[in-house]
From Swiss-Prot:
Disulfide bonds: none annotated. This is Bifunctional glutamine synthetase adenylyltransferase/adenylyl-removing enzyme. The gene is glnE. GO terms for cellular component: cytosol. It comes from the Bacteria. Belongs to the GlnE family. SUPFAM superfamilies: Nucleotidyltransferase, Nucleotidyltransferase substrate binding subunit/domain. It comes from Mesorhizobium japonicum (strain LMG 29417 / CECT 9101 / MAFF 303099). It catalyses: [glutamine synthetase]-O(4)-(5'-adenylyl)-L-tyrosine + phosphate = [glutamine synthetase]-L-tyrosine + ADP; [glutamine synthetase]-L-tyrosine + ATP = [glutamine synthetase]-O(4)-(5'-adenylyl)-L-tyrosine + diphosphate. It holds the Pfam family GlnE. InterPro entries: GlnE, GlnE_rpt_dom, HTH_AraC, NT_sf, PII_UdlTrfase/GS_AdlTrfase. The lineage of its organism: Bacteria, Pseudomonadati, Pseudomonadota, Alphaproteobacteria, Hyphomicrobiales. Involved in the regulation of glutamine synthetase GlnA, a key enzyme in the process to assimilate ammonia. When cellular nitrogen levels are high, the C-terminal adenylyl transferase (AT) inactivates GlnA by covalent transfer of an adenylyl group from ATP to specific tyrosine residue of GlnA, thus reducing its activity. Conversely, when nitrogen levels are low, the N-terminal adenylyl removase (AR) activates GlnA by removing the adenylyl group by phosphorolysis, increasing its activity. One of its GO terms (molecular function) is sequence-specific DNA binding. GO terms for biological process: regulation of glutamine family amino acid metabolic process.
């Protein structure tokens, strides 16, 4: 790069920060002298004197006029533009021009021809100044594109305001405010592409999409509205782009509107919304990312875009969008000259490593994830690179490199266009032309520029290719794989056996079924083509699960349930880590495989690159849930979204456990936090819906008490949820105050039944949780909702020892904060009551003996029921709590924490360590088996992949050692149980 020139003090307000070198020094000085002469002819003595002088400013202008014929000719015709910079700096002058543009349509004597002249003169001056400031280094490229976009906005708004006032004058519209013609006019003009993103280039056309609201206050005749607004739009294009003696304002393109070949220039909003919902394509979704109301009725434009949000930002991540958008890029590459990275003749916008690749890099990821993460919905390219990096979708290196190269390439693009104000993106093919561009950018010569330009393209291409352009050989080097026809290929059978498949002929038959399009997901030719490309990698991944046949059959069942589309294959093809995870699920985790087979949308969350690094704690889950429920929603929709959210998050918590990014204890807390949040949200929805029908009870409040594994925050993937619903109200409360009043007890009983239905009823979106309310006072014989006073009385006067043991895990999970605090205090008080410790231990030991007799363990792997298993540990912890044998500190409900805090007089340090280690082992095995299996653990039918997972989570070398360790641990626990609770009793 050329050295930064030393600033010199002149009366001229533009101080060049860059020293530019002309192509020909003598010619440059001659051109400067000619412009000085033009200034003298115009009577601009101070400008003529300045141009005849010497200094950095004059050197800069001489170079500019030599390098850019467009800027030179503009200066010759209109030297007053340069002269104005003696009185105002560039920014102030641009503001004055913008103000003049805004006032132009409001002048009393304005006509269409006078407006066209005014806009062209203002635009020409602003255009010149923006270019000059850019070349001088006075403005960063980001400011240059913003200035160009603001100029286009102002010109478009001025033309629109003139046309609206004109239509008002003819009685075609009735504008509410002539000083603000666009207000409530119903005419919507959306800027698309670079205009919408405030990223306009120097000689760009502007892309507009035009809609109108026939019900807007200004519309006089709804039936004439389409013709009226289309006519106004046609005139708008003429005002902006027709070439006159004063030039043009902006070339204007309306082809991004819905179905441009058969629709009017202005489309009613309802028709547009119907089109996008029923027929909109992914490229149109991509285009709408950058859409921005730029003129006309801005409020109506914003409202229209809000209506479009569900179309642009899908509820589920959309993988098909990648292939769709990328196919456009492939078509662009098919054009001559775009296949190789070159400098001369290279298309800076569309060529390899060009601007479009950076834009597509950002846009495709926005399409995929913007529905889930609102922060990824921005219009501007570089800020979105920052957001993608912040969310972990791209590396900081990719962000910095692509942002740096984006602005560099935009500077190159501007230089190419500033030469002659032509809408071109192609570098010159001749030596002098390339030298000119190099000098405009501050390089010493074309060679230095070419080196930097080529390095930029290669850097962009490297990041872009890493995201999109993986194209493995179909055989992937693993042997013959032929699945055409209806006869098995012998070499293919051999390849499959080598990969680990036990029934290669059956596998061939399954794969041939895919290629025949027997499933909805494989019915299109493109889908089958993608699956063909993916099959070798699939077979290799499934072969590595050590139960290849079962893994592939489960994957086949998964495919059978998918809707038509190619999303999955595109995703797996471009993401080997995800393919490996999918194979692990299919080979080692039948339960998870069944979940994604029934509910394929849960697979969407696996695309989030932050999945394995972000901890699913309560704050994380709460934020995700809030975003998922945002907006005003109907009751049933809220419940459905809760079911969708819970099923997906259970799956993703499980995947984290499977991948080893969280440990079993954290998984238990995450499953429990998820249940807390979603059940409380369901309670809020039920309460509001119930109150709308039945009103409220005076002073009525509700608290949910989590029991069992929910209370102790030890839920597994397949756990039911134990709850007690408690309520309170004013002492003198009568019937509820709604249209259908209910007495208090009946009111809360009905509300609880509604909650049970909301949470546990099977629906198209599945079940939120299976609820169990049997731990409430009097169990199934008691009412489903319990008044707080009745709860207190029961716990203090009637509850059995086992009920107080169960209460030791109780935790308020939702509802009114005041009542929750009261419930927590009451639970603590009940647990702290004096008890006969010997009697409690005896009753607990007898209870355990009865369970052992009536429900003996099936085998060693029945971890809950085996002697010395989970129940033994839980009973020890619960007895310690209700007999006051837990160390000082906040009340604990988790078994692990209670065992670690057993009082020294109850259990010595050795026993505490032994019991804690046993619980950690049991928790790890239980979490993993409940995650992977739907039924019980069958020792002789364990998927090898699950065996590997169990060894990984317990850090043991082989399955035999694991079983020996499990047996030894249970024997130690039973010994401790006998010592602590049986106290030597036989």
């Amino acid at each position: 790069m050329a050295a930064v020139a030393k600033r010199t003090v002149t009366d001229w307000q533009l101080k060049p920060a860059l020293g530019l070198a002309p192509l020909d020094q003598g010619r440059a000085r001659q051109e400067l002298a000619e412009i000085a002469a033009a200034a003298r002819e115009e009577g601009l003595a101070r400008l003529a004197k300045f141009l005849a002088g010497k200094g950095a400013g004059q050197d800069f202008l001489a170079a500019v006029f030599d390098l850019s014929p467009f800027l030179r000719d503009t200066s010759r015709r209109r030297p007053r533009i340069l002269d104005a910079l003696f009185d105002q700096p560039v920014e102030a002058r641009l503001e004055a021009i913008t103000a003049a543009i805004e006032q132009a349509p409001l002048a009393e004597t304005v006509s269409e021809s006078s407006l066209m002249m005014e806009l062209r003169q203002c635009k020409a001056e602003a255009h010149f100044l923006i270019a000059l400031a850019d070349l001088a280094g006075e403005a960063e490229t980001s400011l240059t594109v913003r200035r160009l976009s603001d100029l286009a906005d102002a010109c478009t708004r001025a033309a629109v305001d003139f046309l609206l006032r004109d239509a008002h004058g003819q009685g075609k519209l009735k504008l509410p405010d002539l000083d603000n013609p666009s207000l409530q006019s119903g005419w919507i003009l959306l800027g698309m592409g670079k205009l919408g993103a405030h990223e306009l280039n120097f000689s760009s056309d502007i892309d507009l999409v035009v809609f109108f609201d026939p019900d807007a206050p200004a519309v006089v005749d709804r039936l004439d509205a389409t013709e009226l607004f289309s006519r106004l739009t046609r005139r708008l294009v003429r005002i902006l782009q027709d070439r006159t003696e004063h030039g043009y304002v902006f070339r204007t393109d309306l082809r991004l509107r819905p179905d441009p070949g058969s629709t009017p220039l202005a489309i009613p909003v309802e028709a547009a919304l119907r089109y996008y919902e029923a027929r909109g394509q992914n490229w149109e979704r991509a285009a709408m990312i950058k859409a921005r109301p730029v003129a006309g009725d801005l409020a109506a434009g914003a409202a229209f875009l809000r209506e479009l949000q569900p179309y642009i930002w899908r509820k589920y991540m959309d993988y098909a969008a990648i292939a769709d958008v990328h196919s456009i890029k492939r078509q662009i590459h098919a054009h001559k000259g775009h296949g190789e990275i070159a400098v001369k003749g290279h298309n800076v916008k569309l060529g390899r490593g060009g601007i479009r690749e950076i834009e597509f890099f950002v846009q495709t990821q926005q399409l995929i994830a913007g529905g889930r993460f609102p922060e990824l919905r921005g219009r501007e390219t570089v800020p979105m690179l920052g957001q993608l990096a912040a969310r972990g979708w791209i590396t900081a290196d990719a962000r910095d490199a692509l942002a740096r190269q984006y602005w560099f390439l935009r500077r190159v693009e501007h230089a190419v266009q500033m030469v002659a104000d032509e809408q071109t993106h192609t570098l010159p093919e001749d030596d002098e032309g390339l030298e000119r561009i190099a000098h405009m950018l501050g390089f010493g010569d074309a060679a230095a520029f070419s080196q930097a330009f080529r390095a930029s393209l290669l850097q962009v291409e490297r990041h872009y290719a890493a995201l999109f352009e993986t194209a493995p050989e179909l055989s992937a080097g693993i042997g013959n794989l032929v699945f055409t026809g209806d006869v098995d290929d012998p070499n293919t059978l051999q390849t499959l056996q080598g990969l680990g498949f036990q029934r290669p002929s059956d596998i061939c038959r399954v794969i041939r079924g895919w290629h025949f399009g027997r499933y909805r997901v494989t019915q299109s030719a493109e889908a089958r083509e993608r699956l063909t490309e993916l099959t070798p990698a699939l077979l290799k991944a499934f072969g590595q699960t050590r139960r290849a046949d079962e893994a592939l059959i489960r994957f086949d069942e998964f495919l059978a349930g998918l809707p038509a589309g190619i999303q999955l294959f595109s995703l797996l093809q471009s993401n080997p880590a995800l393919l490996k995870l999918m194979a692990t699920i299919m080979g080692a985790a039948p339960r998870l495989a069944a979940i994604i087979t029934r509910r394929p949308h849960v697979f969407d969350g696996l695309l989030d690159p932050a999945l394995l690094t972000e901890l699913p704690d309560r704050v994380y889950l709460s934020a995700r849930l809030s975003a998922f429920l945002e907006g005003d929603r109907a009751y049933e929709e809220v419940l459905d979204r809760l079911r969708i959210f819970a099923s997906e998050q259970k799956f993703l918590i499980g995947v984290r456990l499977l991948a080893g990014s969280i440990d079993p204890a954290r998984a238990g807390r995450a499953f429990s936090d998820l249940a807390d949040l979603t059940i409380e949200a369901a309670l809020q929805a039920v309460t509001a819906e119930f109150a709308a029908r039945h009103g409220t009870i005076a002073g009525g409040v509700v608290s949910l008490l989590g029991m069992g594994k929910l209370g102790s925050r030890e839920l597994t993937a397949g756990s039911d949820v134990d709850l007690i619903l408690l309520y309170d109200h004013d002492a003198d409360a009568e019937d509820s105050d709604g249209d259908k009043p209910l007495a208090p007890s009946h009111y809360y009983t009905r509300m609880t039944q509604r909650l049970i239905s909301a949470v546990s009823a099977p629906t198209a979106e599945g079940v939120l949780y299976e609820l169990d309310l049997r731990l409430r006072p009097s169990g199934n014989k008691g009412p489903v909702a319990t008044h707080i006073d009745a709860f207190k009385k029961y716990q203090r006067q009637e509850a059995w020892t086992w009920e107080h043991m169960a209460l030791s895990r109780a935790r308020a999970i939702g509802g009114d904060t005041g009542l929750c605090a009261e419930v927590e205090a009451e639970v603590a008080a009940v647990l702290g009551q004096p008890r006969d410790a010997a009697k409690v231990k005896t009753e607990a030991a007898d209870m355990r003996a009865m369970i052992e007799k009536e429900k003996p363990a099936r085998d060693l792997w029945d971890i809950k029921l085996i002697p010395g298993g989970l129940i033994d540990l839980e009973f020890i912890a619960q007895v310690a709590v209700i007999t006051g044998q837990v160390g000082a500190g906040p009340r604990a409900t988790g078994t692990a924490e209670i065992l670690s805090r057993l009082a020294p007089g109850f259990a010595d340090a050795g026993a505490r360590q032994e019991l804690g280690a046993a619980f950690a082992l049991y928790l790890a095995l239980t979490q993993m088996t409940r995650l992977c299996l739907t039924g019980s653990f069958e020792r002789d039918d364990v998927p090898p992949g699950l065996s590997d997972l169990l060894l990984a989570v317990t850090d043991l070398p082989d399955f035999g050692v694991l079983e020996a360790h499990l047996k030894e641990t249970s024997q130690k626990v039973r010994k401790d149980f006998d010592l602590l609770l049986r106290a030597g009793r036989p």
